[in-house]
Amino acid sequence: MSDLVFYDVASTGANGFDPDAGYMDFCVKNAESLNLAAVRIFFLNAAKAKAALSRKPERKANPKFGEWQVEVINNHFPGNRNNPIGNNDLTIHRLSGYLARWVLDQYNENDDESQHELIRTTIINPIAESNGVGWDSGPEIYLSFFPGTEMFLETFKFYPLTIGIHRVKQGMMDPQYLKKALRQRYGTLTADKWMSQKVAAIAKSLKDVEQLKWGKGGLSDTAKTFLQKFGIRLP
């Protein structure tokens, strides 16, 4: 009869997860240790971190990015993918979204152009750059190419969603990858609400994205200028 006895199990999803609350908790806990250098190292090595975690069976890990070390839930190892994730737990995906928002906050909260320039030259988005998009397209657009930014559709002006829509329309991405963005809130609005109430804002966001100088495997003007320093000139 034991095979007919059942028990409740912990949820495998982050039901009730509030990205804004999670982000604030993250900022409080990392206020003293987080800096642009560490964020730069994270974004340049996030893919490598995922690959390394996929080979480690431990449920938790403590990757170090420069001098900044952080505990993450390892949901990349095949046997760990259904493990529960708490509201304030960190994953590589959540870290990506949190750090992108942190960079945007640092950018918008400071009117000093020298600080803006420091951020632009320090933080590199490999995904945006590989599509020919640079900081000159605007901080919200540039940072929205980072995974995890879909958690903050209002902060990033729908760009995480509309970048995905454009890539699907151009055959650059499978439509299934839009699911995560289409489940998110926009501020206090649930997905079913903003899908009907924010059509104009989404259309404007998509228009901005479609007007970018897209180039598959292309280089941004910043990247071209960088290469010119080494005697490489591109059209």
UniProtKB/Swiss-Prot annotation:
Q: From which domain of life does this come? A: Viruses
Location comes to: Virion
GO-annotated biological processes: symbiont-mediated suppression of host gene expression
Q: Which Pfam families match?
A: Bunya_nucleocap
Please tell me where RNA binds in this chain. Answer: 17-18, 47, 50, 75-76, 81, 94, 124, 126, 129, 167, 177, 179-180, 183-185
Task: Name the major location.
Answer: virion
Q: Which GO terms describe its molecular function?
A: RNA binding
Keyword Ribonucleoprotein tagged:
yes
Q: Which UniProt keywords apply?
A: Capsid protein, Eukaryotic host gene expression shutoff by virus, Eukaryotic host translation shutoff by virus, Helical capsid protein, Host gene expression shutoff by virus, Host-virus interaction, Ribonucleoprotein, RNA-binding, Viral nucleoprotein, Virion
The UniProt entry's GO CC annotations, sorted and at most eight, read: helical viral capsid; ribonucleoprotein complex; viral nucleocapsid
Has keyword Methyltransferase?
no
Subunit structure and binding partners: Homotetramer. Binds the viral genomic RNA. Interacts with host PABP1.
Domain comment in the entry: The N-terminus and C-terminus are involved in homooligomerization and play an essential role in viral RNA synthesis.
Give the similarity note.
Belongs to the orthobunyavirus nucleocapsid protein family.
Function of the molecule: Encapsidates the genome protecting it from nucleases. The encapsidated genomic RNA is termed the nucleocapsid (NC) and serves as template for transcription and replication. The NC have a helical organization. Seems to participate in the nuclear relocalization of host PABP1, thereby inhibiting host cellular translation.
Task: Please identify the protein, giving its name as recorded.
Answer: Nucleoprotein
Recorded source organism is Bunyavirus La Crosse
